[in-house]
A protein has these predicted regions:
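Strongly charged
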Residues: 1-109
């Protein structure tokens, strides 16, 4: 599995926009900070929809008074909290559902 970092995204943006890396990096940082800020300020839930990419959603979880620690088998209480969820767009879903043989000949621009 390949791991892509923010630096890789900055490179792609710089290449796509035909600008130097040091000019593209603040743009990527600003987008990431805007997404993170929106999620962290969610009261208590929010939904960030990015067309042709997907939806980030902050959801509330219920408290689990009888959860179990898998290592010790001890019964523990897990309080209600928020979590993030990502739902890919139809475009991404269709791409990911392609048979692997077809993907070998497909390159994303």
């Amino acid at each position: 599995m390949i791991t892509y970092t923010k630096r890789d995204i900055v490179r792609r943006v710089a290449e796509s926009m035909d600008v130097p890396l040091n000019q593209a990096e603040p743009w990527v940082d600003t987008i990431i900070e805007a997404l993170r800020g929106t999620i962290m300020e969610a009261d208590p839930t929010c939904r960030i929809e990015l067309r042709d990419f997907g939806v980030f959603e902050v959801k509330e979880t219920k408290a689990k008074p009888k959860a179990r620690n898998p290592k010790t088998n001890e019964v523990i209480y897990v309080p209600a909290h928020r979590k993030t969820h990502f739902k890919p767009s139809k475009l991404l879903k269709e791409f990911l559902r392609q048979p692997l043989e077809e993907l070998e000949n497909h390159k994303v621009d």
